[in-house]
A protein has these predicted regions:
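Conserved, charge-rich beta-strand/loop surface module that forms ligand/interface-binding patches
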Residues: 45
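Structured beta->alpha junctions
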Residues: 13, 38, 66-68
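A short gly/proline-enriched turn/hairpin at secondary-structure junctions
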Residues: 33-42, 111
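Short, low-complexity N-terminal intrinsically disordered segments enriched in polar/charged residues
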Residues: 1-30, 119-129
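A beta-strand edge to alpha-helix "cap/lid" segment located at domain peripheries
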Residues: 1-4, 50-129
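Structural detector for helix-capping/boundary residues
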Residues: 30-31, 103
Length: 129
């Protein structure tokens, strides 16, 4: 289970980076919940989470630096680049906690060590709590 959990979250980031939204959606539980405690943003449901990623502004990339996984959960440490092929672009470290059940991602919680205000969202799925 641990290796499959690790593989699942790596597929999540690979599909996101590739903008392969069909593959991305297949990894998600219908009742997925996504939260960002720092900005108090929340998205409920796989369709909302997909829309959140699909409409993220800019040509970004998330490079996975580390994965720690055990049965039913995983953590990734990311180097998030705001411009895919520009090494001079802004970079942020992201720490993402995943919960997994029955081979699907059920909960995602993002932590960003640097303070920031979220960018304007094109997705109507994002609410603040």
């Amino acid at each position: 289970m641990t290796s499959s959990c690790k593989a699942l979250v790596l597929r999540h980031w690979q599909a996101a980076n590739d903008r392969d939204w069909t593959a991305f959606a297949e990894l998600l539980a219908d009742d997925l919940v996504y939260r960002v405690p720092q900005t108090r943003e929340q998205v409920r449901g796989a369709a909302g989470y997909l829309d959140f990623f699909r409409t993220w502004p800019g040509d970004w990339r998330a490079d996975v630096q580390q994965v720690i996984a055990e049965a039913g959960q995983a953590v990734t440490v990311l180097n998030f680049l705001t411009e895919r092929d520009n090494p001079q672009a802004a970079q942020m470290t992201g720490i993402t906690f995943f919960e997994v059940q029955d081979g699907k991602i059920t909960r995602v919680t993002d932590h960003w060590p640097e303070p920031y205000e979220p960018p304007p969202r094109a997705s109507a799925q994002v609410t603040r709590y």
